[in-house]
């Protein structure tokens, strides 16, 4: 099964959207195998957004992600990355379809509620950045036989 990293950003946490987001992912059939409410250090934020280092908006990304608590998660399932990206919607909430998390709750690109890995490589890197191996609980659920 594929794993993906998803993070409710500070705006989503402050707007109390964690429960709604968890519900959408669970109803879709993904399995939560790791989760924690945490503050992101500047060092971790810089590593998380390293592909944007040197771009004009890099500082804003780091400032925003360190401005308050985030809810970091690891989800597992068939095509988990693509499924999560579909649930999340386009980066710019104004372009995100209704029914997606960003389409329903996002206001503008700078505060777009949620982050999701965009490839197996970024998922592995982000999971390793935010979680220790012993923080992930992989358990074969009986429901998997009804989904996959």
UniProtKB/Swiss-Prot annotation:
Which NCBIfam families did the record assign? PRK00668.1 (NF001908)
The protein's organism comes out as Bacillus licheniformis (strain ATCC 14580 / DSM 13 / JCM 2505 / CCUG 7422 / NBRC 12200 / NCIMB 9375 / NCTC 10341 / NRRL NRS-1264 / Gibson 46)
Quick check: keyword Cytoplasm in the entry? yes
SUPFAM superfamilies the record matches = Nucleoside diphosphate kinase, NDK
* Protein encoded by which gene: ndk
The EC number(s) given in the record are 2.7.4.6
Q: Which amino acids does the record list as binding ATP?
A: 9, 57, 85, 91, 102, 112
SMART domains assigned = NDK
Matching entries from CDD domains are given as: NDPk_I
Q: Does the keyword Chaperone apply?
A: no
Q: So what does this thing catalyse? A: a 2'-deoxyribonucleoside 5'-diphosphate + ATP = a 2'-deoxyribonucleoside 5'-triphosphate + ADP; a ribonucleoside 5'-diphosphate + ATP = a ribonucleoside 5'-triphosphate + ADP
Source organism's superkingdom? Bacteria
**Which named protein is this?**
Nucleoside diphosphate kinase
Q: Which positions does the record annotate as the modified residue Phosphoserine?
A: 122
Subcellular location per UniProt equals: Cytoplasm
One GO MF annotation is: ATP binding
Task: Summarize subunit and interaction data from the UniProt record for this chain.
Answer: Homotetramer.
Q: What's in the keyword line of the UniProt record?
A: ATP-binding, Cytoplasm, Kinase, Magnesium, Metal-binding, Nucleotide metabolism, Nucleotide-binding, Phosphoprotein, Transferase
Concerning its family, UniProt says: Belongs to the NDK family.
Which InterPro entries does the record match to this protein? NDK-like_dom (IPR034907), NDK-like_dom_sf (IPR036850), Nucleoside_diP_kinase (IPR001564), Nucleoside_diP_kinase_AS (IPR023005)
Which sites are catalytic? 115 (pros-phosphohistidine intermediate)
Q: What does this protein do?
A: Major role in the synthesis of nucleoside triphosphates other than ATP. The ATP gamma phosphate is transferred to the NDP beta phosphate via a ping-pong mechanism, using a phosphorylated active-site intermediate.
